[in-house]
Amino acid sequence: MESGARPIGSSCSSPAALSREYKLVMLGAGGVGKSAMTMQFISHRFPEDHDPTIEDAYKIRIRIDDEPANLDILDTAGQAEFTAMRDQYMRAGEGFIICYSITDRRSFHEVREFKQLIYRVRRTDDTPVVLVGNKSDLKQLRQVSKEEGLSLAREFSCPFFETSAAYRYYIDDVFHALVREIRKKEKELVLAMEKKAKPKNSVWKRLKSPFRRKKDSVT
């Protein structure tokens, strides 16, 4: 993976800069490790001390399945309340990573609130989502089983990962999976539009075919 992280607003004249940009949004209760996951993905480092996030944005250029991708990642605060700013980035976001901590059952219950928030703003259940149970290295403090996470992911029809931001377990997989989900949805949309655009048989063609079959049966 390229470590080409660059600050917001910087310019880049390389051809890869013109590749597809994916707007990803991190959601989840406070303290579940959203910022640590993002920083591990962007810069391969784990922040030992980190102030609670208000809102941070990161950009990185990578390749996923041999296709270039410019990721624009928004790391949000840990509240599910509706605000005008949240409405704005929920509409602009193309895919969402909803995180909870396996050591905090309350954060797991709040996952549904964030999923409902996505629906409330976008009015569709078809938005690409990846569900993440973070802090998998703290097994002795586990409050949420892996089976519960898998069950909720099946309900959401989305990929699921248990991660460790501290040890960088499955961090890349989460972001790559979300980009794949976005690409899959885009391909499905293109196919649906192409199918809709195909010319249908005329009324006369549909009327003639039973007559033709009847005539053939008589002869």
Curated annotation (Swiss-Prot):
A GO molecular-function annotation: G protein activity
Binding-site residues for GTP, renumbered to this chain: 28-35, 75-79, 134-137
Gene Ontology annotations of biological process type: Ras protein signal transduction
Any GO CC annotation of this UniProt entry: plasma membrane
Catalyzed reactions: GTP + H2O = GDP + phosphate + H(+)
Listed Gene3D superfamilies: P-loop containing nucleotide triphosphate hydrolases (3.40.50.300)
SUPFAM superfamilies, sorted: P-loop containing nucleoside triphosphate hydrolases (SSF52540)
Expressed in which tissues: Expressed in many tissues.
Regulation: Alternates between an inactive form bound to GDP and an active form bound to GTP.
CDD domains, per the entry: Rit_Rin_Ric (cd04141)
Keywords: Cell membrane, GTP-binding, Hydrolase, Membrane, Nucleotide-binding
The EC number(s) this enzyme carries: 3.6.5.2
Pfam family, one: Ras
Enzyme class: hydrolase
Subcellular location(s) per record: Cell membrane
NCBIfam families, per the entry: small_GTP
Homology family: Belongs to the small GTPase superfamily. Ras family.
Binding partners and assembly: Interacts with AFDN, the C-terminal domain of RALGDS and RLF, but not with RIN1 and PIK3CA. RLF binds exclusively to the active GTP-bound form. Strongly interacts with BRAF, but only weakly with RAF1. BARF and RAF1 association is dependent upon the GTP-bound state. Interacts with RGL3.
Function text: Plays a crucial role in coupling NGF stimulation to the activation of both EPHB2 and MAPK14 signaling pathways and in NGF-dependent neuronal differentiation. Involved in ELK1 transactivation through the Ras-MAPK signaling cascade that mediates a wide variety of cellular functions, including cell proliferation, survival, and differentiation.
Other known facts: Stimulation of the NGF and EGF receptor signaling pathways results in rapid and prolonged activation. Shows rapid uncatalyzed guanine nucleotide dissociation rates, which are very much 10-fold faster than those of most Ras subfamily members.
Protein name: GTP-binding protein Rit1
Lineage: Eukaryota, Metazoa, Chordata, Craniata, Vertebrata
